[in-house]
Amino acid sequence: GLAPCELCLKQRTVYWVAGAVAIVAMIVVRLPGGPRLREASCWLLALVFLVSVGVAGYHAGVEWKFWPGPQSCSGGGTVTVAALRDLLNGGGVKMPACDQPAWTFAGLSMAGWNTVASMILVGFSVAAALRERGRT
């Protein structure tokens, strides 16, 4: 597998939040009076995915050298427990730098593709919210 940098981990956090929002929304809309909250849930998911567009777009911009990344993203940032264990066992483990894409496809890094995917998810969420608005 590819070791994630600090900004990669921040991108994952947004998806954990989206998953939590979606699970809570699925439960709430089944409660009495809950169906009225479907539209709001869709708008909230759109907002979460819009944050994802920002985080992933920022990371892609760092990779393309459009702007500098955070100081902690220079390849020596946060160390995970697994990395610390490997280091204690004699292996030198270094967090990857945020400005070095670990993988690219069709000219886009994983951060670039995440930006595209997040934009699509914003579109789906907005479309679902507007569809719910039309039902009420």
Regions found by a protein language model. Give the residues of each.
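Immediate flanking context of iron-sulfur cluster ligation sites
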Residues: G1-A3, A22-A25, G61-W64, N89-G90
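Loop-to-helix transition at the N-terminal end of transmembrane alpha-helices
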Residues: L2-V17
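Alpha-helical transmembrane segments of integral membrane proteins
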Residues: R12, S41-L45, N114
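Structural signal for the C-terminal ends of transmembrane alpha-helices
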Residues: I23-G33, V126-R133
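Interfacial segments of alpha-helical transmembrane regions
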Residues: L31-V53, G123
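C-terminal TM-helix exit segments that contain a strictly Trp-centered aromatic cap at the helix terminus
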Residues: L50-F66, L84
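Extracytosolic (periplasmic/ER-lumenal) interhelical loops and adjacent juxtamembrane/interface segments
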Residues: W64-S109
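A hydrophobic membrane-anchoring alpha-helix module
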Residues: V93-T136
